[in-house]
Amino acid sequence: QWFGPYPPVNYIN
């Protein structure tokens, strides 16, 4: 899970 101001660049849905 990502808890940042923006989604990760290398995200895998």
From Swiss-Prot:
Tissue: Salivary glands.
Protein name: MP1 protein
